[in-house]
Amino acid sequence: MMKALIALSRLIDAVNEHVGRAVYWLVLAAVLVSAVNAMMRYTFNLSSNAWLELQWYLFAAVFLLCAGHTLLHNEHIRIDVLSSRFTRRTQVWIDVFGTMFFLLPMAFIIMWMSWPIFMNAFHSNEVSSNAGDLVRWPARLLIPVGFFLLSAQGISELIKRIGFLMGMIPDTLEKHQDPALEALADEATK
């Protein structure tokens, strides 16, 4: 059973890795939209709320769709002041507890509560109240999709932590850095 769960975890990891890498390009798109908007506004005195809202949509996509990717790479903000004093097994148990009782319930609740908002916007073909009339449902869809990716990655991380505690897989959180990078980091701190 655990081998099948570990395979599922690897599949979830691969999906979030691919989504994250694809969404990186939206940062460039947001920068380009912002630059074109500023250039049009200051050069030709043309301004459009649609361009500003498009920037907002792109930023929302980056923020929401990369949450699972960020969790995959253990880059979410956490307070390590206390946990750094614990053994690795204790840290893993804290991660299991936090994932089961905080991350997953919160992500499931947000998914569940945001789905009707998306459906309402989709069925009513809701548009922006600002000039430009961008449809709102794509931005509303980002919320449940982003939290689905985050909760799936949370399940993957839970599987990996339990696999580690059972001795079935190595610690996936160990940082394996390039020795040259470690030497540079050591030199920089001197």
Where are these regions (language model features)?
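Alpha-helical transmembrane segments and membrane-interface helix-loop junctions
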Residues: 1-190
